[in-house]
Amino acid sequence: MRTFWIVAVLLVGVEGNLLQFNKMIKIMTKKNAIPSYSSYGCYCGWGGRGRPKDATDRCCFVHDCCYEKLTDCSPKTDTYSYSLKSGVIICGGNDPCKKQICECDKAAAVCFGENLSTYKKRYMFYPDFLCTDPSETC
């Protein structure tokens, strides 16, 4: 069920930030966000609970925390400006909210890239009912 909602949200929001986040992930990991990160572990995808399963899942936990810190922003739909220079993502634009969203997405994409060696296929489409450990706080 969680996977269905993730795909539905991603399809509805393709004009917005989620498509941009997918592109950043592709740049940093050479993987498509769907299916690689759309329902990975306890935090990648819609919602999150429990303890992150590994370093990749922790990237998603930190990304969720980053979004939570944004006030008066719409991180799942706002579009932002960014460029790529020598393999480095540069967030741009004059809107502070959109720039912060971009920085959250950039940090997660970089984190995914840095943790490719520990990525575990067994955590793809991980059922959230198995995320029973006490949740961490941001």
UniProtKB/Swiss-Prot annotation:
Signal sequence range: 1-16
Role of this protein: Snake venom phospholipase A2 (PLA2) that displays edema-inducing activities, as well as presynaptic neurotoxicity and low myotoxicity. PLA2 catalyzes the calcium-dependent hydrolysis of the 2-acyl groups in 3-sn-phosphoglycerides.
Cofactor, free-text remark: Binds 1 Ca(2+) ion.
UniProt source species: Sistrurus tergeminus (Western massasauga)
A single cellular component GO annotation: extracellular region
Reactions that this protein is recorded to catalyse: a 1,2-diacyl-sn-glycero-3-phosphocholine + H2O = a 1-acyl-sn-glycero-3-phosphocholine + a fatty acid + H(+)
Documented EC number(s): 3.1.1.4
Keywords of this entry: Calcium, Disulfide bond, Hydrolase, Lipid degradation, Lipid metabolism, Metal-binding, Myotoxin, Neurotoxin, Presynaptic neurotoxin, Secreted, Signal, Toxin
Top EC class, one word: hydrolase
CC cofactor: Ca(2+)
Keyword Secreted in record: yes
Binding site for Ca(2+): Y43, G45, G47, D64
One MF term in the entry's GO annotations: calcium ion binding
GO process annotations (BP): arachidonate secretion; lipid catabolic process; negative regulation of T cell proliferation; phospholipid metabolic process
Cystine residue pairs: C42-C131, C44-C60, C59-C111, C65-C138, C66-C104, C73-C97, C91-C102
Active site: H63, D105
Family, per entry: Belongs to the phospholipase A2 family. Group II subfamily. D49 sub-subfamily.
Cited InterPro entries: PLipase_A2, PLipase_A2_Asp_AS, PLipase_A2_dom, PLipase_A2_dom_sf, PLipase_A2_His_AS
The protein, known as: Basic phospholipase A2 Sct-N6
Subcellular location: Secreted
Tissue: Expressed by the venom gland.
